[in-house]
Amino acid sequence: MSARKTAQRVEAWHFLANDRRFGHDDGNIAAPGYVYSVEGPIKLCEWGLHASERAIDALQYAPGNMIGRVVLSGEIIRGDDKLVATHREYLWIADAEETLRSFTRWSALQVIHLWNAPDIVRRYLESGDKSLRSAAESAAESAANLAANSAAYWAAHGAARSAAYSAANLAAYWAAYSAASSAANSAANSAAYSAQNDELEKRLFALGEAR
């Protein structure tokens, strides 16, 4: 992982646990308008206040469904898919569970043409009707032709998983499956992932504006 230091303000995304508490048992609860600080030296993955400039990258590290739009400042170290800083301010925080589930269904629909999806699976992905979710999951599990395009199948199967699963975890995993199944090579995969990020950020910004 490459890393370089900067000293500027950077807007980014940070997912929180559902109770908004920070990790490492430090007792802090995130709230909009507050600036949280740590003393250096900071180090990626080890010490400091982290966030990602792309929402799709932040999703990989999500401990829950609460999304925060943040500003990092002070000393900042940039990595490949995240940053760490000495200061992090929350501009707003929102519960993104339904937004993430909707995004997961959207991701699966982008590749549904790559496998012979049962009708009820398609209906659930298009509507988000919770009364169809259990039947859609069962139908996806019993689909006989899943080997034809396993990544597309798993993207749809994951979108229909039970509400007991974290929406953030589902969205992260199945967005990756969807991007992989739609891409013929690494460049195409990167483009598909960027398109997913654009869609996710559009939905998250709309969520923030609707608070």
Regions of interest found by a model, annotated:
Residues 1-211:
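Short, glycine-biased loop/turn motifs at secondary-structure junctions and
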